[in-house]
Structure formats: C-alpha cells, structure tokens
C-alpha cells in the first residue's frame, strides 16, 4: 500500500500514555471520573444549559483527584448529533428527525427503560411555555397516551429549530453549526462528540456534512 502521510488523533504513543477517558451518562459517573482524574465522555443527550452545573462540579471535584494514570486529564467532551448541510432549515429538520429516531422505541438506549422519554424530555429542556397549551392534547381525553407515551409524543413534537437553538443538536448550515458548537463551548465543554452517520441521514448527505464541518465549521475554532 502507498499511503500518504496522515495525522492520527489521538496519538497512539504518548508520554507517559494517552489521556484516560471515561464513558459517562449520569452525575454519579461524572463524580467517579473526577475522583480518579479521568476525562469525561458525556454520552447523555441533553441541552448544554442543563449540563453546565455538572461541568462546573466536575471542574471543582477534579482539583482533589487522585489520578489513576500518570496525570490528571481535566477534560470534558459533550455528545450530540451533528449534521451540516447547504440548506439551513432542511439540515435542521433532518438532524431533528435523526436524533428522535436514534432514541426511538426499542432502540439500544431506550429499550426496557420506562422513564427514558420523561428524562430525555427534561434533559432536552422540556416543553417551552409557548407550546405548552398545544402539547396538552396528549394528556386526557381521547388522546391520553399514558405509560410514558405522553413524554415520548411531546419529545417527537419538539420543533427542529428549538432543538438547534438549545444545542440538543448541532445542525443547519455552517453558520448555524458554528453557533451550535459555541453553545457547548460556552458552558465549559472542551470537545464536541458529533455522531453524523445516523440511519435516517442518507450517506451522500453524511459525506457532505463531514465536508462542510471540515472546510467551514472546524476552522472557525482554529484559535
């Protein structure tokens, strides 16, 4: 094979070793990571505004860490869905559809978890006041869904623009995606972990999204 020189991240060989990270989804795991001087890979889906308190506590707790490795890795990475497209609204709608399907019924992250949609709805920022009266149709009367169906239905009705505005998804055209990443940056996150290859997004659009992130979004954070 004739492979041109390429930069590999993270570096497989580092002194004394590559940074140690921990997959975390809840406050107790953030505390464990801080206690042992481990970086947080936060895979809990949520709006940045709701994550700030956890990042602040992690930063404070890690000051007294007893590191399990050769150094303290005081870093926090937020997971979210990322989709960048040439058409702003189309990309937001597709990103919204993709993350809702990602957490759809009987998916790995939702199967056999009775309260998953109630918790997701809360972590995504809840039902906004201006939509509360419209969403009330899911409770009571002929459309009463009961048994966790209400928060699932409400979650499914949250507008794409709202999810993007809250930073639940980083989606839209390059300018919107830059603003979305900034929402995570502003609460103290060091990195954004963007899942792009969801099954609801066609492969050609995934490739275009990667191209736009590489050419237009990432350079905005070069400094």
Language model region names:
Residues 20, 33, 58, 91, ...:
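Conserved, mostly hydrophobic/aromatic
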Residues 84-88, 202-212, 222:
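Short glycine/threonine-rich loop-to-helix capping motif typified by GTGT followed
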Residues 45-48, 194-207:
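Glycine-rich, proline-tolerant flexible connector loops at the mouths of alpha/beta enzymes
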Residues 20-23, 38-43, 74-81, 192-194:
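Hydrophobic faces of well-ordered beta-strands that scaffold small-molecule active sites
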Residues 2-38:
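Aromatic- and glycine-enriched pocket-lining scaffold segments that form the walls
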Residues 25-55, 59:
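A conserved active-site cap/scaffold subdomain adjacent to cofactor or substrate pockets
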Residues 32, 36, 183-190, 220-223:
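A structural motif corresponding to the C-terminal end of an alpha-helix
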Residues 1-9, 49-189:
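An alpha-helical appendage that flanks or caps ligand/catalytic pockets
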